[in-house]
Each structure stands twice: as structure tokens, then as C-alpha cells.
Amino acid sequence: MTIAFYAGSFDPITNGHLDVLRGSLLLADKVVVAIGVQAQKQSLFSFEERVDLITQVGRDLLNVGPDRLQVISFNNLLIDTAREIGASFLVRGLRDGTDFDYEMQMAGMNGIMAPELQTVFLPASISGRVITSTLVHQIAAMGGDVTHFVPQNVAQALRLKFKF
């Protein structure tokens, strides 16, 4: 069984992340979404809320269940967790040249430490290239419409978070 390992903060999951998940599901039998949990980093959504949002997206928009999409946490080196779960490859999304430069450096470092794990880059769709979780936070915090940038369940969760 091929297992794609897709790590990030997913705070919250965006349509750009959804693009990468769709592509990953085409390449692997199973995708493990690994949410990085760092005590010193303040998150808008709790780990449990992010798991629920991603699981709902998998079920409702991607039509996949826990046999194809699993959500876990990690707080160590990404490659260590990828090895622990038996990942076949790492998945990273690319929006622009800045992402490419950063992700190539990370892939190089990961490749030295874990040569058995290749990194597969998936380009964002044209509409997904402008989306960042940070911008989504800012728009939602000011009561703006984020429905173009996040799945419907996430837009609803943001409305509840920011009470608008």
C-alpha cells in the first residue's frame, strides 16, 4: 500500500490544501495528514477542531473515509513521523517560486536524513495560489467572506470563532 504523508499546521484547512489532498489521493492508496503541534505556537483552532474539519472535508468533499484519509499529530521531525507510519513519500504543495525555493531546501535536508523518502511536489490550482491560512484568518477576523478560500465547513467554523 502506498502512503502519502502530508504535513502542515492546517489552521485552518484551505482550498489550497484541498487541491493537494485531491492530488495526493490520486497518487497513493492512503493519505496521512499530519498536523504539526507546537506548544509555543498559538493556533486559532485546537488540534481536535482541525482533525474534525479535515475529516469532514475528506468525507463530504473528497468522498473518502478513514481507510483512505487519516489525520494524526506530530511534534518531532517530520521524517521521523513519516517513517513511523510507513510513508511511501512526502507531499508538499507549491503556490509560487517562494514556496518552491523553501520546499526544495526542505526536501534536500529531508533527503539527506531520510533518503528512502522522496518529496512529491503538487502545484496549487490557479485559484489556490493566493490562499494562505494567515490571510484567511485576517479576512475572517474582520468579518469578511472567506467562502472562496476555504471549504464550507471551515467557513462556518470561522464564523463561529469570530462570532459574525
Swiss-Prot record:
Gene assigned in the entry: coaD
Record keywords: ATP-binding, Coenzyme A biosynthesis, Cytoplasm, Magnesium, Nucleotide-binding, Nucleotidyltransferase, Transferase
Cofactor: Mg(2+)
GO biological process, one term: coenzyme A biosynthetic process
Similarity comment: family membership: Belongs to the bacterial CoaD family.
Major subcellular location class: cytoplasm
Keyword Cytoplasm assigned: yes
Binding site for ATP: 9-10, 17, 93-95, 103, 128-134
Residues that hold substrate according to the record: 9, 41, 78, 92
E.C. no: 2.7.7.3
Protein name according to UniProt: Phosphopantetheine adenylyltransferase
Subcellular location as annotated: Cytoplasm
Pathway per the UniProt entry: Cofactor biosynthesis; coenzyme A biosynthesis; CoA from (R)-pantothenate: step 4/5
GO MF annotations in UniProt: ATP binding; pantetheine-phosphate adenylyltransferase activity
Biological source species: Bartonella bacilliformis (strain ATCC 35685 / KC583 / Herrer 020/F12,63)
Cellular component per GO, a single term: cytoplasm
Site entry: Transition state stabilizer: 17
CDD domains associated with the record: PPAT
Reaction catalysed by this enzyme: (R)-4'-phosphopantetheine + ATP + H(+) = 3'-dephospho-CoA + diphosphate
Listed Gene3D superfamilies: HUPs (3.40.50.620)
